[in-house]
Amino acid sequence: MSITKEFDTITAISTPLGEGAIGIVRLSGTDALAIAQSVFKGKNLEQVASHTINYGHIIDPKTGTIIDEVMVSVMLAPKTFTRENVVEINTHGGIAVTNEILQLLIRQGARMAEPGEFTKRAFLNGRVDLTQAEAVMDIIRAKTDKAMTIAVKQLDGSLSQLINDTRQEILNTLAQVEVNIDYPEYDDVEEMTTALLREKTQEFQSLLENLLRTAKRGKILREGLSTAIIGRPNVGKSSLLNNLLREDKAIVTDIAGTTRDVIEEYVNIKGVPLKLVDTAGIRETDDLVEQIGVERSKKALQEADLVLLVLNASEKLTDQDRALLNLSQGSNRIILLNKTDLEQKIELEQLPADLISISVLTNQNINLIEDRINQLFFDNAGLVEQDATYLSNARHISLIEKAVQSLEAVNDGLALGMPVDLLQVDLTRTWEILGEITGDAAPDELITQLFSQFCLGK
């Protein structure tokens, strides 16, 4: 984005397109008030107090035609999200009216905002750092209240503060090394000995490794668990999916092979988003369409974080059952013995002891599945600790891992007896990597790519 483009006054519809009670068209930039005033009949928006809502009408300045009756919010820089003048036009919801107002604003001199450009301006103007900007997107995409809690904490600056404090400590250490090298005669500056540098780098490494330990939980809460429901045809997989969803989304019949594809749905299990994948029954078949579904099922099984293997308690184990037991061995697997409301014929002695007996028909023990998921992935601990900072973003996790590797290189060098001044490079690299997380040292291409993932109007 060019410098000129960054200072344009931008506009976009900030509410989802479609019918609704309210639509919002947003403006941000130096000329936001003047452009809004040029299509507004009511109070002079350039003279009203900041953070006020003003009643009036949007008109076409060429024809004088009234477009809509509106409420206009005026917010003056720097006390706005973008730290620029911001105007929000609250219209009646609807595709036609919001689009008409948007086109009027563009004709009056505003530029159509790019995806995420309002948040990008907040970042460029110092209102938020990169982790906080990403948290805005996480709040929008949060599927559960727990995921939203983590995102809100990140928006509040908890991760930024931890990273910035660590970077400052590393910078202090680097400065001390520099002074010792350049001004060895200064007695009032503590000497950065090998032992002291090892102590400091181990402290930094321990802090970052502790943060990495939160990544598994944070990533699950942010992105969800990819969960494959597997089993031979007609054991109750689709019925289980519907039971967990509490609505009929999959085809449920008594005919084997009716689920010919992979069906995906999200469900909230005690704050954990599960991406449920109801797979076609895995069996040998001559039906080409069903064969494709079976292959997709095997792929879903390989990629799943969690496997729910459904067996039929009212029938003896089949070769297909045994094949699935072997295929899913070693994965995070929960074996579900369905149809326990019927006479049981399955050979329990051939199955692992930690299975869960359920009846999808009567809802028996369905709650135990939720408890087992909590046990498998969270060791029965609370999902979100109130004061903890969580890593949940893959970009952050990758950069923290690289920072730890750089610190390990410093410690390896110290163990080999390398001089302190030669280890500055790796310590400086650690400082730079952490800066990429907050955006202090992030390349322009990365920033552009990140904000392009946002929706229009945000």
UniProtKB/Swiss-Prot annotation:
Positions annotated to bind K(+): 234, 253, 255, 258
A molecular-function term among this protein's GO annotations: GTPase activity
GO cellular component assignments: cytosol
The protein's required cofactors: K(+)
Protein's GO biological process: tRNA methylation; tRNA wobble uridine modification
Compartmental location: Cytoplasm
Enzyme class: hydrolase
Protein residues bound to GTP: 234-239, 253-259, 278-281
Family recorded in the similarity comment: Belongs to the TRAFAC class TrmE-Era-EngA-EngB-Septin-like GTPase superfamily. TrmE GTPase family.
Designated name of the protein: tRNA modification GTPase MnmE
Organism from which the protein derives: Streptococcus pyogenes serotype M28 (strain MGAS6180)
